[in-house]
């Protein structure tokens, strides 16, 4: 489906954005999250300039995203290492099983 205009409120300002209908709930949730972040920043920093608050919130979100990307990379690397170790263990077990089978086969002849 094509994107349709959706009105959202960000920090007391109306904003119309195009959004696919199936993503409208996620957009509304993101707007709520941003509003909460801006409100929290306003209280915590005592900055009253909306533009400054928006930039600070954007920087915070970018920082959080970078941290999560790093965690994802670390997790993926860890999983790749574990998979390699598991593959080696399985291959070693199969080789040993093959050796045992070969030995057992020769004993029965």
Swiss-Prot record:
Subunit structure: Homodimer. Interacts with FtsZ.
Entry keyword Nucleotide-binding: no
HAMAP family for the chain: ZapA_type1 (MF_02012)
Entry-linked Pfam families: ZapA
Stretches of the chain forming a coiled coil according to its record: 21-99
InterPro entries: Cell_div_ZapA-like (IPR007838), Cell_div_ZapA-like_sf (IPR036192), Cell_div_ZapA_eubact (IPR023771), Cell_div_ZapA_N (IPR042233)
Keywords: Cell cycle, Cell division, Coiled coil, Cytoplasm, Septation
Domain of life: Bacteria
GO terms under biological process: division septum assembly; FtsZ-dependent cytokinesis; septin ring assembly
Xref: NCBIfam families: PRK10972.1 (NF008209)
Entry's family note: Belongs to the ZapA family. Type 1 subfamily.
Purpose: Activator of cell division through the inhibition of FtsZ GTPase activity, therefore promoting FtsZ assembly into bundles of protofilaments necessary for the formation of the division Z ring. It is recruited early at mid-cell but it is not essential for cell division.
Protein's recorded name: Cell division protein ZapA
Annotated localization: Cytoplasm
Keyword Cytoplasm: yes
GO cellular component: cell division site; cell septum; cytosol; plasma membrane
């Amino acid at each position: 489906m094509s994107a349709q205009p959706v009105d959202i409120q960000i920090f007391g300002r109306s904003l119309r954005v195009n959004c696919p209908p199936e993503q409208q709930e996620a957009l509304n949730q993101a707007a709520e999250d941003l509003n909460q972040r801006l409100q929290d920043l306003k209280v915590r920093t005592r900055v009253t300039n909306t533009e400054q608050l928006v930039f600070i919130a954007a920087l915070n979100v970018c920082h959080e995203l970078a941290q999560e990307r790093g965690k994802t990379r670390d997790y993926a690397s860890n999983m790749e290492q574990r998979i390699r170790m598991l593959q080696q263990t399985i291959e070693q077990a199969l080789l040993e099983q093959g050796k045992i089978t070969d030995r057992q086969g020769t004993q029965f002849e």
